[in-house]
Amino acid sequence: MMKIYLDVCCLNRPFDDSTQDRIRLESEAILTILERCLSGNWSLVISEITEAEIDRIPNNDRKQKVRSLLLIHREYRMVDTSIEKRAKEIQKLTVKAYDALHIACAEKSKVDIFLTTDDSLLNKVSRNRHALKVRLENPLKWLTEVISQ
């Protein structure tokens, strides 16, 4: 079964302004991915960091909507000392602390793909793919690739 880690940018995307084509298409891709996780075709992995980052969303209505998407997860990863240590290594690649923790959790969970809509993160890791144990991709690009196979 395909194991998928969505960062909080992805989980927020369906609630962003969908009048922009990119946002609308990414939202549709994310909702399709979540539907496949709900149907049991794929497995959604979340982490303690996912919940901590969602807790920082200032708008309570949005926070509850994003939190509701977590209900379909199949695996929950707690942060331990090995994840913290790995996150510090990932931060040396100029990756922000929360992003590094997400990536370290995804690596420890042995996910098949880590999805994010964060272009800055994707650019940083594209220069350092060799140093990571998980593939990071934009959800629209990845879903298009998977569907066309």
For each feature predicted by the language model, list its residue ranges.
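Acidic, PIN/NYN-like endoribonuclease modules and their adjacent C-terminal/linker elements
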Residues: K3, L11, D17-S27, K92, ...
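PIN/NYN-family metal-dependent endoribonuclease catalytic core
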Residues: Y5-P58, Y76, P139-E145
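Alpha-helix capping/helix-boundary segments
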Residues: C10, T50, I83, L101-H102, ...
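Short amphipathic alpha-helical segments and helix-helix/interface helices
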Residues: I30-E35, V66-R67, I103
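Acidic catalytic patch
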Residues: I49-T50, L71-K92
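Short, electropositive alpha-helical surface patch
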Residues: R56-I72
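Short beta-strand scaffold positions
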Residues: M78, A97-A100, T116
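Mid-chain, well-packed structural core segment of small domains
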Residues: V95-A104, V111
